[in-house]
Amino acid sequence: MASLVTFPPALGFAALWWVMGPGPVTVIVGLIAAALGLVTVYCTAMIYASLKPIRQWNNKHTAPNYMLLALFSGAMLLALLLACWTGQAGLAGLLVLVAGLLAAAAKLAYWRFIDTQKPLATLASATGLKEYGAVRPLDAPHFTENYVLREMGYQIARKHAAKLRRITLATAFLLPALLALLAGLGLVPALLIILATLLTAMGLFIERWLFFAEATHVATLYYGR
């Protein structure tokens, strides 16, 4: 619903900018579209944050991460448009730098949290046999992989996850922020912003993949995971 409400002012802003330029009415409609865009991102984040069986999503870090990633990627696209349209990144480059560093800090805090968070349940507590000591399954519920294991029980080695996290930090946040800063200072803005945008797209793709790959549903306890 939030996304549907956002479309009219967003399209209106684009039309006004094209026809009238950056006048008062255009600015007001643009601010409304931006505010509704943030509301849409927040609603999307809460879809995941409200899923209690998945501890990697059901926490206080999910929504702020979504908001900061949206601000960062939006600032990057704004800088790209300005650089390609006017030949200068200007203050948008500095905005990318600030938003990128904030998003990187939030992402690090999120990873630290899910790495140190205690499991929501154990096989013993899930089966109600906690008072009898250690519990282990005698047999798997299924002989072949099913939807739960395929979508919510993906196993990624810790060393591989750590490597992908480092790649994410470098390509999604640090390098683009540095390139945007240089572009904002007037150093071949268009070329640097295009490169920064491509790096951001690649880094955020890996970040989104990790967000889903590292999530585990409590139902996987019954499969010995």
Where are these regions (language model features)?
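Surface-exposed loop/turn and secondary-structure junction residues enriched for glycine/proline
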Residues: 51, 214-215
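Membrane helical hairpin/interfacial module
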Residues: 1-9
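N-terminal signal-anchor module of multipass membrane proteins
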Residues: 201, 213-214
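Membrane-proximal cytoplasmic C-terminal regulatory module of class A 7TM GPCRs
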Residues: 216-225
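Long, contiguous internal "core" modules enriched in hydrophobic/ aromatic residues
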Residues: 9-206
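Short, function-defining helix-loop hinge/capping sites that tune catalysis or transport
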Residues: 115, 215-216
